[in-house]
Design a protein with these regions (language model features):
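Glycine-rich beta-strand-to-loop/alpha-helix junction loops that act as flexible
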Residues: 46-48, 81-84
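His/Asp/Glu-rich metal-coordinating catalytic cores
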Residues: 55, 82-139
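Anion (oxyanion) recognition and catalysis
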Residues: 71-72, 99
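Short phosphate-binding/catalytic loops that engage adenosine nucleotides
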Residues: 75-76, 103
């Protein structure tokens, strides 16, 4: 199995007031080109999809466009986790629908113990969590 591991997309990031959305779109095109060229079986996004927990509307729209292209049009399964900059509650709102399209997004610790299987390979997606969440989960 071949997969492309990415992380820290930080969609919506501004650098000293300069909007990076155009650069982020270009980076996504490069990620998609690599996925196609290498004929990967899945794309991993290991946290920090957005730059802040309440991203700007434009950042959400751009990320949606990216996932429609990668997952629905190009048919790459996407394995993603929330990072410390993401709001797990906001990200998980489409969870049941996402899984039907092979867009797997884990945002809570308890989800990490349920494997996602692609081509007889199991993935365990461990999202960012606060230490208190682990203590409460394992008590």
């Amino acid at each position: 199995m071949k997969f492309l591991h990415t992380a820290d997309w930080h969609i919506g990031k501004k650098l000293h007031g300069f909007d990076l959305l155009a650069e982020q779109r270009e980076a996504f095109k490069q990620i998609l080109a690599i996925a196609k060229e290498e004929q990967v079986d899945a794309v991993v996004i290991a946290g920090d999809l957005y730059d802040r927990s309440v991203p700007a509307v434009e950042a959400v729209e751009i990320f949606n466009e990216m996932m429609i292209q990668m997952n629905l049009k190009e048919h790459f399964p996407v394995l993603a986790i929330s990072g410390n900059h993401d709001s797990s509650t906001r990200l998980e709102t489409g969870g049941p629908w996402f899984n039907q399209t092979q867009f797997y997004l884990n945002t809570r610790l308890e989800q990490a113990f349920q494997p996602i299987e692609i081509d007889n390979t199991q993935f365990y997606l461990l999202p960012y969590f606060e230490p208190i969440a682990a203590r409460l989960y394992f008590e």
